[in-house]
């Protein structure tokens, strides 16, 4: 039943072509824009503090990503986020590398405190550090660490009063009450930079068109993971360069039937 709903949301994204405003990092800007276009959304990358408030209020969703943060982008994120909050636009936050440095951790916590976030998406270490728990970080990627990811997602969602998606070998998304685990995707995603960042923006596209934000987030995770599996069938053995191309193709060609056939989502207690 839920896979049927997810397939319908995929169709709706393409029908409505939502505008997703990204204040993201320099490493992933091109990949993020092309990924959103391939899916059927409309990306805009606007960073200047003089215009971000106006852009955010007309967007379907606002995505904030601190991968290559600096003081100018932080200011722009706060301006855009407050504008989005005032106009009912969902704000999604990707706390890239939270825990790697005090600057990243403090910035992540500040954004989470000062803005009304609809979603936070990160790996387990990033999410843990946003709520003040220590998980081991290497660069901006989390090592395998102890702790129950489902419990962490629930706790973070309750503490931050938002929907939290923790992605890894198994993806988990929770609003603090309802929790889903998603068992799609492919390991080669970790060999292409920006796949997590694009995922947050894809979640923005789904959040823009769905009333039930938790299901919207789960839908994005399932669709993204299924597209990765389809791309990996064609290119995983060739390498990450070919996979990146096939992944964009898979996002573009993904169907509701693919979702029903390959989607693997569980509701957790």
UniProtKB/Swiss-Prot annotation:
One of its GO terms (biological process) is thiamine biosynthetic process. Substrate binds at residues 45, 194. InterPro entries: Hyethyz_kinase, Ribokinase-like. It catalyses: 5-(2-hydroxyethyl)-4-methylthiazole + ATP = 4-methyl-5-(2-phosphooxyethyl)-thiazole + ADP + H(+). It comes from the Bacteria. GO terms for molecular function: ATP binding; hydroxyethylthiazole kinase activity; magnesium ion binding. Its cofactor is Mg(2+). Pathway: Cofactor biosynthesis; thiamine diphosphate biosynthesis; 4-methyl-5-(2-phosphoethyl)-thiazole from 5-(2-hydroxyethyl)-4-methylthiazole: step 1/1. Keywords: ATP-binding, Kinase, Magnesium, Metal-binding, Nucleotide-binding, Thiamine biosynthesis, Transferase. ATP binds at residues 121, 167. It is an enzyme of class 2 (transferase). Its EC number is 2.7.1.50. NCBIfam families: PRK09355.1 (NF006830), thiM (TIGR00694). Belongs to the Thz kinase family. Catalyzes the phosphorylation of the hydroxyl group of 4-methyl-5-beta-hydroxyethylthiazole (THZ). This is Hydroxyethylthiazole kinase.
